[in-house]
Amino acid sequence: MATPPKRFCSSPSTSSEGTRIKKISIEGNIAAGKSTFVNILKQVCEDWEVVPEPVARWCNVQSTQDEFEELTTSQKSGGNVLQMMYEKPERWSFIFQSYACLSRIRAQLASLNGSLRDAEKPVLFFERSVYSDRYIFASNLYESDCMNETEWTIYQDWHDWMNSQFGQSLELDGIIYLRATPEKCLNRIYIRGRDEEQGIPLEYLEKLHYKHESWLLHRTLKTNFEYLQEVPILTLDVNLDFKDKEESLVEKVKEFLSTT
């Protein structure tokens, strides 16, 4: 029996063939269409995978694909932290943002050891990143007085430490910004009918839109991560229904990937 060839000993961000896994974050406002968009992308190419936001964990519900996954300690203890945050933001914003970032890091790190390890041209699409966790959502809650000075300081310290431990594995090769007006996002919130989000006011979406524009369109938002200033960004107008221009959007993504 012939001895099988030795396989390349790969790092978490490298496929078993030695090809680096491209990591692309899909960013945008609440209900801009990120979940719909990543579902489109994962059907395009077998070398493309997506890591959806772990919303089920935030709502303390096991999603279908996690049917056999062991519950985390936080899930066993109960509590819909997403709903708690929306209902009483001054009390729960710090808890929610910390857990949202933790669960995101856990999901994204786990994905690096998935089926893409055998892919020829692997691309991993994250539904949001640890950077929007901090510089869009947590920052907005602090500026809206939903986090006090002590909580914000602790959150930033914790975020810096988590990134010092795991951030290199999650560094982005590109960002796709799904750009939609706050009014369109509010309409989509009503349509998708997620109970926790039904009380979101337009003003909240407008604040998040402004931050996304500053970070991803005008590139004036400052972060602690210098490399982000040079990360390529593809901006897609998604005010229209994806069904009307799905093929065009996919082609733009392919072209973007060829240059990153």
Swiss-Prot record:
Q: Which reaction does it catalyse?
A: 2'-deoxycytidine + a ribonucleoside 5'-triphosphate = dCMP + a ribonucleoside 5'-diphosphate + H(+); 2'-deoxyadenosine + ATP = dAMP + ADP + H(+); 2'-deoxyguanosine + ATP = dGMP + ADP + H(+)
What is its subcellular localisation?
A: Nucleus
Entry's EC annotation: 2.7.1.74, 2.7.1.76, 2.7.1.113
Q: Which family does it belong to?
A: Belongs to the DCK/DGK family.
Q: Where is the active site?
A: E127
| PTM annotation | Phosphorylated and activated in vitro upon phosphorylation at Ser-74 by CSNK1D/CK1.
Source organism's superkingdom?
Answer: Eukaryota
Q: Which UniProt keywords apply?
A: ATP-binding, Kinase, Nucleotide-binding, Nucleus, Phosphoprotein, Transferase
Gene Ontology, cellular component aspect? cytoplasm; mitochondrion; nucleus
Mind listing the GO biological process terms from this record?
dAMP salvage; deoxycytidine metabolic process; nucleoside phosphate biosynthetic process; pyrimidine nucleotide metabolic process
Q: Residue positions of the PTM Phosphothreonine?
A: T72
- The protein in question is named Deoxycytidine kinase
Q: Which GO terms describe its molecular function?
A: ATP binding; cytidine kinase activity; deoxyadenosine kinase activity; deoxycytidine kinase activity; deoxyguanosine kinase activity; deoxyribonucleoside binding; magnesium ion binding; protein homodimerization activity
| Keyword check for Nucleus | yes
SUPFAM superfamilies xref list: P-loop containing nucleoside triphosphate hydrolases (SSF52540)
What is the role of the protein in this entry? Answer: Phosphorylates the deoxyribonucleosides deoxycytidine, deoxyguanosine and deoxyadenosine.
Q: Which residues carry this modification: Phosphoserine?
A: S11, S15, S74
Entry binding sites for ATP? 28-36, 188-192, 240-242
Q: How the protein assembles, per its UniProt entry? A: Homodimer.
Q: Indicate whether ATP-binding appears among the record's keywords.
A: yes
Q: Which gene encodes it?
A: Dck
> Any idea which positions bind substrate?
E53, Y86, Q97, R128, D133, E197
Q: Which Pfam families match?
A: dNK
List the InterPro entries hit by this protein, alphabetically: DCK/DGK (IPR002624), Deoxyribonucleoside_kinase (IPR050566), DNK_dom (IPR031314), P-loop_NTPase (IPR027417)
Q: Which organism is it from?
A: Rattus norvegicus
